[in-house]
């Protein structure tokens, strides 16, 4: 009967632990869903893992979008899967914090007689510290949840940035092909004129050099596209046949109405999960600080029962008590260490807040500068280049300029288009970095994990 009861108790503890683990990761997953529109999946050998694998394969069969690439990473990135285990470790710490230490049983048998001495001791002081330890461990669990959530959001932003970087490199590669074709045509025309004796050696060499440079630029652009594709492969965690995904080769246009950038610094301070994690770490440290010194002194306080049986058969039973005497170590080192750790966490919190504000300003300025370049290029530079092409075509038809001049003007137009695409790529990459710096959406309702009202500074 006792064995059955023990088994039931262990089973109940396991079920409660699994339920708490699901709830903890569910909090993180829901926050990620609200901030990214995508749900994270923790692969732990559950039936949901098989469904996630099927969904992953279906995503990779279709042309990838930024959102689809983020979803692939949340399902398949192994570094993220390793990060998810931090929640399991922190949850185990909560369970351990709620358990009493095992009692100690000692027995002594003296030969050749029948004298027997037995003692059962337990650290009774653990019962007093149990609630405080659990509160501190729960604060550390909340910190772990926030750290995991921050890593997920960081990875999602990195995937978006890598996606737009690769998409831009593909588009630049297509323009590089046009430049190379124009340079090849110009070099071929120069060769024919040179063979007919109508152009100088210097002119032919110049056109051939321009063609060679265009080929080098094209090779460099293609190498960048391969490199950015591998970067995206790594972030999504794909390999083998999974890397045969496709993607649209053109960047999307920037939104007509740019999002407001006022208040982004304050928004980042409110919703950055790594900052929330530091708040909970400091809260856990503050909760444990109050009893750490007393625990250091009283941790050897033991109470129990003592049994002695003498040789003639007489025996005696009575209580046993062991009390440490704090003559030398009365917890001063533990207290100083705990206070230093708390101050350290407070300074890290303040330092991270300063860094976050700086990151937001830098990413915001990069995004706005790139947007200004895109708008100026589309409204002024490209239309002007188009007019120059039209005028040059008319002059070429009237035999007022040479074919080389016409091809040169065409190359300059393509180069202007390349600069516009680079600015467009930089805009989307900077926007993804700004979302990472802000810790989520750039507008709308502030979204947070459930937080304690207590903060690092006790406000």
Language-model regions, residue ranges each:
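Long, charged alpha-helical "stalk" segments
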Residues: 46-47, 83-85, 226, 278, ...
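Periplasmic alpha-helical coiled-coil/stalk elements that build and connect Gram-negative outer-membrane
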Residues: 3, 132, 139, 146-267, ...
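Terminal intrinsically disordered/low-complexity segments used for targeting and assembly
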Residues: 1-72, 222-267, 435-459
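A small-residue-enriched
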Residues: 19-40, 67, 71-126, 229-238, ...
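Outer membrane beta-barrel translocator domains of Type V secretion systems
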Residues: 106-108, 112-123, 129-147, 164
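Amphipathic alpha-helical coiled-coil segments and their boundaries
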Residues: 66-69, 76, 83, 123, ...
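Short segments within alpha-helical structural elements
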Residues: 184, 213-240, 348, 353, ...
């Amino acid at each position: 009967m006792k064995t059955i009861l023990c088994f039931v108790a262990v089973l109940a503890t396991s079920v409660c632990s699994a339920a708490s683990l699901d709830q903890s990761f569910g909090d993180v997953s829901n926050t990620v869903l609200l901030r990214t529109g995508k749900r994270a999946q923790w692969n732990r050998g559950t039936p949901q893992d098989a469904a996630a694998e099927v969904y992953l394969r279906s995503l990779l069969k279709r042309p990838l979008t930024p959102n689809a690439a983020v979803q692939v990473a949340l399902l398949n990135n192994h570094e993220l899967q390793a990060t998810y285990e931090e929640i399991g470790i922190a949850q185990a710490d909560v369970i351990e914090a709620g358990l009493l230490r095992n009692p100690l049983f000692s027995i002594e048998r003296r030969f050749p007689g029948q004298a027997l001495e037995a003692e059962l001791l337990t650290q009774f002081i653990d019962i007093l510290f149990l609630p405080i330890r659990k509160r501190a461990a729960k604060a550390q669990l909340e910190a772990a949840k926030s750290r995991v959530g921050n890593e997920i959001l960081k990875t999602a932003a990195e995937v978006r940035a890598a996606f737009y970087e690769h998409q831009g490199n593909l588009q630049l590669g297509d323009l590089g092909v046009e430049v190379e074709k124009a340079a090849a045509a110009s070099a071929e025309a120069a060769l024919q004129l040179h063979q007919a004796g109508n152009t100088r050696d210097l002119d032919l060499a110049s056109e051939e050099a321009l063609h060679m440079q265009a080929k080098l630029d094209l090779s460099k652009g293609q190498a960048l596209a391969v490199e950015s594709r591998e970067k995206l492969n790594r972030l999504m965690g794909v390999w083998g046949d999974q890397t045969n995904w496709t993607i649209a080769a053109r960047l999307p246009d920037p939104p007509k109405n740019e999002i407001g950038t006022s208040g982004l610094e304050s928004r980042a301070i409110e919703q950055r999960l790594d900052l929330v994690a530091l708040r909970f770490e400091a809260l856990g440290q503050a909760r444990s600080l109050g009893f750490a010194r007393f625990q250091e002194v009283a941790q050897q306080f033991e109470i129990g029962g003592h049994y002695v049986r003498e040789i003639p058969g007489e025996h005696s039973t009575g209580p046993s008590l062991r009390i440490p005497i704090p003559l030398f170590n009365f917890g001063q080192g533990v207290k100083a260490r705990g206070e230093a750790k708390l101050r350290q966490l407070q300074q890290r919190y303040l330092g991270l807040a300063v860094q976050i504000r700086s990151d937001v300003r830098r990413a915001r300025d990069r995004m706005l500068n790139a947007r200004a370049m895109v708008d100026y290029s589309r409204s002024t530079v490209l239309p002007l280049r188009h007019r120059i092409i039209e005028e040059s075509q008319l002059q070429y038809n009237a035999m007022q300029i040479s074919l080389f001049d016409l091809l040169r003007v065409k190359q300059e137009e393509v180069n202007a288009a390349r600069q516009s695409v680079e600015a467009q790529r930089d805009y989307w990459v900077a926007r993804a970095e700004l979302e990472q710096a802000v810790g989520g959406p750039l507008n709308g309702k502030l979204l947070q994990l459930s937080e304690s009202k207590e903060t690092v500074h006790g406000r």
